[in-house]
Amino acid sequence: MRLGIVCGSFHRDEVERMLEYARDEAASKNWEVADVAWVPGSMEAPLALDRMLHRDEIDGAVVLGIIERGETDHGLVMGQSVTKAVIELQITHNKPIGLGIIGPGAEPEHIEPRLEPHARAAVGA
């Protein structure tokens, strides 16, 4: 299995750690991380995923990111939009995509303990 991983860079330090957990999980399954793409945030992930999944050498993908709770419903709307787009991309390309986005609505104190389990679960999906 050759994976592509799309990472949202809005919380870059935390997402870099998620990427390392995802790489480790892929290696434990003898899977190859064939490509990593960084995008500004979770909202830009679907386009990067679409481009990645068009490539024959990519068998599946993972998206990693964090959507914190804000003062408005923007994060919730963004999370729903990204999730819907990811599901549509899986169907369109007939390739699995593991969703490793923490949130929407994550409080700062909830982010740290979720980094590893979300990243590893996304690879396993």
Residue map of PLM features:
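Short, active-site-adjacent cap segments at secondary-structure transitions
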Residues: 44, 68-69, 104-109
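C-terminal binding/interaction regions
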Residues: 75, 80-125
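Short, ordered loop/turn segments at secondary-structure junctions
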Residues: 9-10, 66-67, 101-105
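Short beta-strand segments at enzyme active-site cores
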Residues: 36, 60-64, 96-102
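N-terminal beta-loop-helix "entrance" segment that forms/cooperates
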Residues: 35-51
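Glycine-rich phosphate-binding loop
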Residues: 47-86
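Glycine-rich phosphate/diphosphate-binding loop of Rossmann-like nucleotide-binding domains
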Residues: 1-40
